[in-house]
Design a protein with these regions (language model features):
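Hydrophobic alpha-helical segments, principally membrane-spanning helices and signal/leader peptides
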Residues: 4-6, 25-26
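Bacterial N-terminal signal peptides
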Residues: 5-15
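Beta-propeller domains with acidic blade repeats across secreted/periplasmic ectodomains
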Residues: 20-270
């Protein structure tokens, strides 16, 4: 029998308590019975991890050792400020191989992390999608904890709308061509790649409840450095260092992530 392990995640709208480092609700969430899931008889649904190992996850990736790297969005939208020290990337592990998570710790927590929507792990480099930035954390000593005095933090690209909005910068993935791919919802962007080429990603979508560092409304219809006019949500292909960026799709509403086959065909929701 094949087993499907799921994160059991529950949005708890309760009065909260704060401590110096980690936000915690004052009550435990109720569990949803796995019997509620309808699957093929050859499959089984099991719970792999629950709160307090993680809270309100927004994205995840699995590294070559089977560890789960999860972004959290406790400070999402109207609850911004709930966790004063900022949101986190947490690392989850099953250390005794019994099919359940038994270890959870913080990789990085910063006040500037506000419901980041994407995480990708390549060896000891962790990429975080935190508008307006696409950030790379290099875990130099490979201890699974970001230490500013030892490790490296680099902004690969910047200029993506909107901060604390789910129509913004989403997760990065890799393709068989050695390129990196990522997408952004229809909040728009104005960003310059490491080759010096500027892209104006316009559109008509806007609203309150978020911070908009780029004026995508003003730049709607403006020609980008590649000679094209792009609009709305989009996907980008680039070198791992942020150079030679190309727009590979646009006109989307809010594509959350993309996946590429071994032949380079890309699939994404619109």
């Amino acid at each position: 029998m094949h087993i499907i392990s799921l994160f059991a995640i529950y949005l708890v709208t309760l009065t909260i308590t704060l401590n110096a480092e980690v936000w915690k609700p004052d009550k435990k969430p109720g569990l949803i019975p796995t019997s509620m899931f309808e699957v093929d008889p050859s499959l089984e649904v099991t719970v792999w991890a629950t709160s307090p190992m993680l809270y309100n996850p927004t994205n995840m990736d699995i590294d070559h050792e089977g560890r789960f790297w999860v972004t959290e969005g406790v400070n999402y939208r109207g609850r911004n400020g709930t966790r004063p020290n900022g949101d986190r990337i947490v690392v989850l592990q099953d250390t005794d191989n019994d099919g359940k998570c038994d270890s959870s710790h913080t990789f990085v927590q910063e006040k500037g992390l506000i419901a980041p929507m994407g995480v990708a792990v390549f060896d000891n480099v962790v990429y975080l999608s935190q508008p307006p930035d696409l950030i790379a954390y290099t875990d130099v000593n490979r201890n699974l904890v970001f230490e500013p005095e030892i490790d490296k933090r680099e902004v690969i690209l910047t200029g993506f709308n909107a901060i604390n909005h789910d129509h913004s910068l989403h997760s990065l993935t890799s393709g068989p061509d050695g390129k990196f791919y990522f997408n952004n919802g229809n909040c728009g962007a104005v960003f310059t790649d490491k080759s010096g080429k500027t892209f104006y990603m316009g559109g008509t979508y806007g609203g309150s409840g978020a911070n908009w560092p780029a004026d995508h409304l003003k730049n709607s219809g403006r020609e980008s450095g590649d000679g094209h006019v792009w609009t709305s949500g989009f996907a980008v292909r680039m070198d791992p260092n942020g150079a030679n960026a190309e727009i590979v799709s646009h006109g989307l509403r809010n594509s959350y992530e993309q996946i590429l086959t071994s032949f380079g065909d890309m699939f994404q929701n619109p």
